[in-house]
Amino acid sequence: MKKHIFEDARAIAAFLVSVFDSRLKTQEILWLALSGGSTPREIFRTWAHEFRHHLDWKRLRFFWSDERCVPPTDAQSNFNMTHSALLEPLEINPDAVFRVRGEDAPESACAAYSQEIEARLPRQRGVPCFDIILLGMGADGHTASIFPHEIELWDHSGCCVVATHPDTGQKRVSFTGHLINNAHEIYVVVTGREKQDMLASVASDPHASVPLHAWTLPKRSGCWIPLLRGLYPRKQCKPTV
């Protein structure tokens, strides 16, 4: 994995815009899956206000790597956060937005989202292929909504699964490793000192039973982990391969 250190969310936002722009120079549509959380919110706001004229946002198609099973107006909804921070300010056409129907029964929402992805995305090796997937990592090593206590869901053969939060029992719809590993590029944004030990484990422990350790990308895929500077002591803040 390659690792980049960024000063703040704006620097990550600028980096990702350059990634999007590079892809849009060689293709008409960019298929993008987003994540939720506080850091993505700041990135999305920066895109909407500082980079709105740097990119033809109408050529992006928006999906989510995971979603809580709540209505789209709920404060916990990843779609709701993205809509207010990014989609609405940029006046993105609803036809370019593909959300999980979190208000439906979890199994129904999961099946419908899997079908949407299967029907719309281009395919590589017989599997739907996103151009770019943005992910985060929890302090327990989870990514999307695949938690360590349900690590077997990572290897599910479908595009999406119904996952359960280990503490609250809340149901979520999540991408699987089957779908994530097939993306052209994947970027994991990790912030917070509380994640330092887990990130070190993911990077060095071959037996770590966390989803990101099961992340086996083809060599053609750019596997980057953008980090905010506060994650590590200053002396460790340098790009590595």
Swiss-Prot record:
Which reactions is this enzyme annotated as catalysing?
A: 6-phospho-D-glucono-1,5-lactone + H2O = 6-phospho-D-gluconate + H(+)
A GO molecular function for this record?
Answer: 6-phosphogluconolactonase activity
Report the EC code(s) recorded for this entry: 3.1.1.31
Q: What is the uppermost EC class here?
A: hydrolase
GO annotations under biological process? Answer: carbohydrate metabolic process; pentose-phosphate shunt
The pathway where this protein functions is: Carbohydrate degradation; pentose phosphate pathway; D-ribulose 5-phosphate from D-glucose 6-phosphate (oxidative stage): step 2/3
Q: Supply the Pfam families for this chain.
A: Glucosamine_iso
- Which SUPFAM superfamilies did the record assign? NagB/RpiA/CoA transferase-like
Alphabetically sorted, this entry's keywords are: Hydrolase
**Family named by the database record:** Belongs to the glucosamine/galactosamine-6-phosphate isomerase family. 6-phosphogluconolactonase subfamily.
Q: What task does this protein carry out? A: Hydrolysis of 6-phosphogluconolactone to 6-phosphogluconate.
What is the name of the protein in this document? 6-phosphogluconolactonase
